[in-house]
């Protein structure tokens, strides 16, 4: 990923499989920020060091907020550091990140390692990308993962994309901005690899 020039990465649930210290050691080799706004240590700091980042291209500032399913302890409880971390509802963590970002960005993108709909928390939706969007409608781009299904839709002005596992396809998001960096058109395309 360093070789490919990644701008950022969002944690997935499998990064936690060997415990948080091992994950942090491995991810420490990344030359880009690894994002997890909703998983913090006892001091309230993201376990990866960052919850969001701003990427600037061609004068456009894109805020990327990363969240992972807060269900990690269901699968990995008992592994080193897992039970010491705090797993916040993704919709709440995204809202806090958007508040922190304020007017620093022209475009808000959320990279959510979770499906559109709740996997375990059907009442609260803490693990639902749809709940993130419902509570934070100012999101411009929502990238989803975890369920390994294709998602290609638009809700309001938000484009949403998700792809299958194994690198079989990628989601391409196209945004058209005016001279003031306001989005005037957006689309998502799922591209077979």
Question: Model-predicted segments: where are they?
Answer:
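Acidic, metal/ion-coordinating pockets
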Residues: 1-193
């Amino acid at each position: 990923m360093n070789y490919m020039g990644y701008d950022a990465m969002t944690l997935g649930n499998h990064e936690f499989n060997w415990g948080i210290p091992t994950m942090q050691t491995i991810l420490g080799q990344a030359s880009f920020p690894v994002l997890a706004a909703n998983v913090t240590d006892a001091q309230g700091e993201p376990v990866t060091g960052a919850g969001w980042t701003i990427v600037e291209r061609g004068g456009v500032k894109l805020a990327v907020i990363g969240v992972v399913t807060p269900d990690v302890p269901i699968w990995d409880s008992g592994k080193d550091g897992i039970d010491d971390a705090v797993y916040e509802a993704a919709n709440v963590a995204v809202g806090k990140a958007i508040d922190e970002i304020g007017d620093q960005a022209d475009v808000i993108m959320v990279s959510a390692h979770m499906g559109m709909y709740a996997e375990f928390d059907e009442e609260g939706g803490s693990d639902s990308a749809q709940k993130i969007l419902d509570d934070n409608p100012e999101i411009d781009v929502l990238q989803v993962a975890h369920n390994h299904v294709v998602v290609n839709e638009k809700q309001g002005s938000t484009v949403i994309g998700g792809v299958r596992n194994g690198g079989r396809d990628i989601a391409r998001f196209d945004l058209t901005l005016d001279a003031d960096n306001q989005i005037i058109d957006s689309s998502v395309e799922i591209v077979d690899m």
